[in-house]
A protein has these predicted regions:
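Non-catalytic interface/linker regions that flank or bridge core catalytic/transmembrane domains
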Residues: 13-57
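Short amphipathic alpha-helical segments and their helix-coil junctions
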Residues: 56-61, 83
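Positively charged N-terminal leader segments that act as targeting/secretion signals
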Residues: 1-11
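All-alpha helical catalytic cores of prenyl diphosphate-utilizing isoprenoid enzymes
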Residues: 44-51, 64-76
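Buried hydrophobic packing segments
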Residues: 75-82, 152
């Protein structure tokens, strides 16, 4: 009986802590966007985000940060990594902070409203129980990086470098590359922020969010 109560207490504690972290990340995300992005349309974009699952959605269905709030957490991680890369390359005041905020915070906007929760049977201690898991249900099959550019462009005007950076942030993992396109090489050569955005995304995914390593 005591063991069962302790298990439930631990579950409730973790649930509360996870909700607090999600709210903290949401507050941080909105603050950064409002402080660093002064472009027309940003307020409308943030208001729209409040009506979506952006702040509660996972970053993936089964890979990095496949958990509630993972998408926002990943976006913050990429933003922080991109800031550090730009400061290392150009110095603290040698890069466009607004562009970095737009790219870092919104590069995965395409994942908004694409994940659904379903149930499946899992055996625990010899007993079959139902567990929730994430599935993909994309009602706007526009691609990945290019979809984020498309969605963002409905609210704010992007510079060419911002659009290229978001469009190609997956680098060699992009499905277009797997289909034979190597245009991302041209983008990386011509637009430095595109390369840095890809590196930031990889660092966040494989260093900050690698559960096997952490």
């Amino acid at each position: 009986m005591l063991k069962s109560l302790a298990k439930w207490a631990f579950f409730i504690y973790n649930f509360i802590m996870e909700k607090e972290v999600i709210e903290q990340n949401k507050t941080t995300f909105i603050m950064l966007a409002k402080d660093d992005i002064k472009r027309e349309g940003i307020d409308a974009l943030l208001s729209w985000l409040e009506t979506t699952d952006f702040f509660s959605a996972p970053a993936s269905s089964k890979y990095h940060l496949s958990e509630e709030g993972g998408l926002c957490a990943h976006s913050l991680n990429v933003y922080e990594r991109l800031v550090r890369l730009c400061e290392s390359e150009y110095g603290e005041d040698g890069y466009n902070k607004e562009s970095v905020a737009i790219i870092g915070l919104f590069h995965d906007l395409c994942k908004t409203n694409t994940y659904k929760v379903e149930m499946r049977n899992v055996k625990e201690d010899g007993v079959w129980v139902q567990k929730p898991y994430f599935t993909v249900d994309d009602n706007l099959p526009y691609g990945h990086g290019e979809k984020s550019v498309y969605m963002l462009s409905g609210f704010i005007k992007l510079t060419r470098e911002e659009a290229m950076a978001i469009n190609w942030h997956m680098g060699g993992f992009d499905l277009r590359v797997q289909g034979g396109s190597y245009d991302y090489n041209k983008a990386f050569n011509k637009f430095p922020l595109a390369l840095l955005a890809h590196l930031a995304d990889m660092q966040a995914t494989f260093l900050d969010e690698n559960q096997e390593q952490n």
